[in-house]
Amino acid sequence: MNKLFLLLSFLMGVVVLSSNYLVQFPIKYYGLEEILTYGAFSYPVAFLITDLANRSYGKLVARKIVYIGFAIGVSFTLLFSTNFADLISVRIAIGSGTAFLVAQLLDVQIFDQLRKKKWFKAPITSSFIGSTVDTFLFFSISFYATGIPWVTLSFGDLAVKIFVALIMLIPFRLLLGTLKAVKV
């Protein structure tokens, strides 16, 4: 394993942990508390990491990074932020892990199928589809029948994730040149 693989794996774990923490906090400005949480801003970085790993190493190594991120995220979420007496906390842990794993593995597969197209098609398509799957899996598993406005939160969350995914094309493109120069 080289340093880039370790760095991407570590960053994936950080993104998962940060997002799991930040999703608990609705944005309380401009009436957005019913629509949006802070987790929507950090989570799309996971797709950037997955797509960079996929472009650099291929889908098998990208999957390993997804599994490492999943293990870190679920382990730390269960250890530090899950109150097992509180059903919603357990549902968030299960929803987060399920949504992350399904969406990221889907992202890896879609990216791999589109990798020979123009540079932006694979990351934007895989991130868009992965974000959509992640959002609706997470919110439905975590908050269905709780009284929390999970449908409106999920649409607000998805809108931000798509916006951030578009912005993530900039670092993706810039880092492609760096990764090619390093030739991992």
Question: Which ranges hold each PLM region?
Answer:
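Hydrophobic transmembrane alpha-helices
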Residues: 1-55, 60
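Cytoplasmic-side transmembrane-helix entry/capping segments in multi-pass membrane proteins
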Residues: 5-9, 61-71, 118-125
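Helix-adjacent hinge/juxtasegments
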Residues: 72-100
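Membrane-interface helix termini and inter-helical loops of multi-pass transporters
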Residues: 24-33, 83-88, 147-153
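Residue-level recognition of pore/gate-forming positions within transmembrane alpha-helices
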Residues: 13-16, 70-73, 131
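Membrane-embedded alpha-helical hairpins and interfacial helices in multi-pass inner-membrane proteins
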Residues: 90-183
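Structural signal for membrane-spanning alpha-helices in multi-pass inner-membrane proteins
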Residues: 16-24, 76-84, 138, 142, ...
